[in-house]
UniProtKB/Swiss-Prot annotation:
Coiled coil: none
Name this polypeptide is given: Transcription factor PDR8
SMART domains: GAL4
A molecular function GO annotation: RNA polymerase II cis-regulatory region sequence-specific DNA binding
GO process terms (BP): cellular response to stress; DNA-templated transcription; positive regulation of transcription by RNA polymerase II
GO cellular component, one term: nucleus
Residue segments, region Disordered: 1-22
Signal peptide (from-to): none
Cited function: Up-regulates the transcription of the genes for ATP-binding cassette (ABC) transporters YOR1 and PDR15, for major facilitator superfamily transporter AZR1, for pleiotropic drug resistance SNG1, for alpha-glucosidase YJL216C and for YLL056C.
Pfam families: Fungal_trans, Zn_clus
The entry's keywords: Activator, Cytoplasm, DNA-binding, Metal-binding, Nucleus, Transcription, Transcription regulation, Zinc
Compartments, record wording: Cytoplasm; Nucleus
Length: 701
């Protein structure tokens, strides 16, 4: 029976028209999706079976009306499900392909279990070596059992011995050149009371003094006379003797080191570099002192770090071999004082590693995987003789300098060079007093020498980065160029102030003795001083021969007269030495930069009695002498080159050549003319007497 014949009430509540028969509306039970697709709807709430199967996000019921809904109305809040699913499938596939093709990346959060797979082996003579996870000794000795122990004991008995060869060290040859016993004792005490040990702390005084009675045999009738050395009791003693001799080189012999002592130290270093059976802490102490002695007493040209790089590489390798990168594990039962000394050795190895490698141009020898900077904590450095402020300063410097050096040597650089310099500038601003305290000698008495040590290395890196950027880009932004000028002037000011402040006038007839203050100055500023001097003059010469895109004219193109270098006060170069703000609207003038540099470095050449004594003392240090002589020679050549440039400009101007619009060919011709003029006016320099040459620049060799 057809239900359409039964009368229905209006669902709208409106009265039915009396003159016209109303249309009936059915109650809609199916969802909108099933009704539109003509599917059998289960009418389940809130989701029917058809919508569940298709994973639709919603199921729409329209009970109050039955007119059709468009796709837009039905799914206006719903994404295209099929398209979303396809996108998800493609993303999953892409991720799988990336994982298959990408280089393995090890997450820091998951600790590498191989790092704990190490073993410490103690040799027959007391030498220690920590072997890593790939060593056969680690794999065979990591979990020892009775049979392995028995094998080790039997091997000690049956192990073939090498043929004995005569020692090449000839230790007793040095006896004839030793000072008296009281002089050695006094020298060692002076070393521990002096400024060098004040920043080292790698051993203690009592241990070194005890070596004198044990190693140096005195005459029975004259206790002041050393007649023999006793090195038979302990394999470490050759390094103990080396430590004592290095202290004597620093405080007694100075640069007048006897050939027997020099030969012994050289032979000991060479033997250590080629030996794996002499791994002692004393060896590391010997290498540290040897490096310091090389820096102070080196006569092998101006410092470029090659003079001591082998010592530092061996020092770093020895630290790792002895387990100094994990002192709390391998030296658990040692006294706290011994642990502090070991931490300081590791402390200096890391510092000299990054400093030397940067000066050489290589990445650090010690990799990040072997380094845990969290050891630089107050808990680990509780000794009253160690200032934790210094420890934190070293920690922060190692963090930023190692990052910079590592990034520079990566195959692909992720950041711009200037970002490295900005990080270092931020480090300097955060960890040091206002820069004016280092560039103004008035404040120097309150400055910790350790601060100068770290600051000078930081300045060296910043100045070199800006220099590298200039070389690569050929044209720098105003702010980068001006900041480079600023750091060059700050750096030379720090170097000069350090030398002047730490110079203590010699007493009585000790003019030829190396003063402790200047020894310290060399340690503090040696890499920085030669870097800044060479960088300033290198940039100056490049400026003279159009290596930069911007031209420089030394004469007025309208009048043909020489342009006088402007006074630096007009650009306020002094303000550059008080902070890190630089002008960004205009380049600092080339002439003003050169004049200010001259004024700063010439302050130690000014004619007065104190400077005369200072330069006399400086002449006893070959490293300082050679660096300052390097500056004097560079200046003479630069002055001659400037003169040649001016004369060439005048000649070209007279010829009517438009010098404001140079082509590449014209630039090449111009440089050739400058060079010819320079060769002509500088030929007298090759025949001048050396002493006369330096004397005219107030530098009496």
């Amino acid at each position: 029976m057809d239900g359409s014949h039964f009368p229905m009430k209006s669902t709208t509540g409106e009265p039915v028209s009396s003159g016209k028969k109303g249309k009936r509306r059915k109650v809609i039970k199916s969802c909108a999706f099933c009704r539109k697709r003509k599917l059998k709807c289960s009418q389940a709430r809130p989701m029917c079976q058809q919508c569940v199967i298709r994973k639709l996000p919603q199921c729409v019921y329209t009970e109050e009306f039955n007119y059709p809904l468009s796709n837009t109305e039905l799914f206006e809040q719903v994404p295209n499900v099929a398209l979303v699913q396809k996108i998800e499938n493609l993303q999953t596939l892409l991720k799988e392909n990336d994982n298959n093709n990408a280089k393995p990346v090890y997450c820091r959060s998951s600790e590498n279990p191989l790092r704990s797979l190490r073993t410490s082996v103690l040799g027959d003579n007391g030498s220690r070596y920590v072997f890593g996870p790939t060593s056969w000794k680690t794999l065979s000795l990591f979990e020892q059992n009775k049979f392995q122990t028995e094998f080790q004991n039997l091997w000690k008995v049956l192990k073939p011995l090498p043929e004995c060869t005569k020692s090449q060290l000839n230790e007793n040859d040095v006896v004839a050149d030793l000072p008296s016993f009281p002089q050695m004792e006094s020298c060692i005490k002076s070393f521990f009371a002096g400024p060098l040990f004040g920043i080292l702390h790698i051993f203690n005084q009592d241990d070194i003094l005890s070596l004198l009675d044990r190693l140096f045999i005195r005459d029975t009738t004259d206790k002041n006379l050393v007649i023999l050395l006793d090195l038979q009791g302990n394999a470490k003693d050759k390094y103990n003797l080396g430590i004592v001799l290095q202290i004597l080189c620093l405080g007694y012999y100075n640069q007048d080191i006897p050939s027997s002592v020099s030969h012994f130290l050289h032979t000991l270093s060479a033997a250590s570099l080629s030996s794996s059976s002499s791994n002692f802490v004393e060896k590391l102490q010997f290498f540290l002192l040897s490096y310091i002695s090389v820096m102070i007493n080196c006569t092998d040209g101006v410092w470029d770090a090659t003079q001591g790089v082998d010592l530092i590489n061996e020092l770093c390798q020895g630290c790792i071999s002895l387990g100094l990168n994990d002192i709390d594990k391998w030296y658990l039962n040692e006294s706290e004082e011994t642990k502090q000394n070991l931490r300081c050795i590791w402390f200096w190895a890391l510092f000299l590693d990054v400093s030397t490698s940067y000066d050489i141009g290589n990445p650090p020898s010690i990799s990040d995987d072997l380094l845990d900077l969290s050891i630089f904590t107050a808990q680990n450095f509780q000794s009253p003789s160690i200032d934790f402020r210094r420890v934190k300063l070293m920690h922060d410097f190692l963090d930023v300098s190692r990052f910079t050096t590592r990034e520079i040597h990566k195959r692909e650089m992720n950041e711009k060079l200037t970002t490295f310099s900005l990080r270092l500038i931020e480090f300097i601003q955060s960890n040091f007093s206002p820069i004016e305290h280092y560039t103004n000698s008035v404040y120097y008495s309150d400055i910790d020498p350790f601060d100068i040590l770290i600051l000078s290395r930081s300045l060296s890196i910043v100045a070199s980065i800006y220099n590298i950027e200039m070389i690569i880009a050929q044209q720098s932004r105003i702010i980068d160029k001006n900041r480079m000028v600023q750091f060059l002037l700050i750096s030379i000011s720090v170097c000069v102030n350090t030398m002047v402040f730490h110079f203590k006038e010699p007493i009585n007839d000790q003019e030829n003795v190396l003063t402790e203050g200047l020894k310290l100055s060399i340690i503090l500023i040696n890499p920085l001083l030669i870097r800044i001097v060479s960088q300033v003059y290198s940039l100056a010469f490049n400026r003279l021969i159009f290596r930069e895109k911007a031209f420089l004219f030394l004469i007025d193109l309208d009048t043909g007269k020489k342009i006088q270098f402007i006074k630096y006060e007009e650009e306020n170069f002094d303000e550059l030495l008080t902070g890190f703000d630089v002008r960004t609207d205009k380049f600092l003038s080339f002439s003003g930069t050169i004049i200010r540099f001259y004024e700063i470095i010439d302050s130690i050449f000014a004619v007065n009695e104190r400077n005369k004594r200072l330069l006399k003392a400086v002449s006893n240090f070959y490293q300082l002498t050679s660096t300052l002589a390097f500056e004097r020679v560079s200046r003479v050549l630069f002055d001659k080159a400037s003169q040649a440039r001016i004369e060439t400009e005048k000649i070209w101007l007279k010829k009517g050549i438009n010098m404001e619009h140079f082509s590449d060919l014209m630039i090449e011709d111009f440089i050739n003319d400058v060079w010819k003029t320079f060769k002509e006016i500088s030929k007298d320099l090759w025949s001048i007497d050396k002493k006369k040459f330096y004397k005219q620049y107030h530098f009496d060799l």
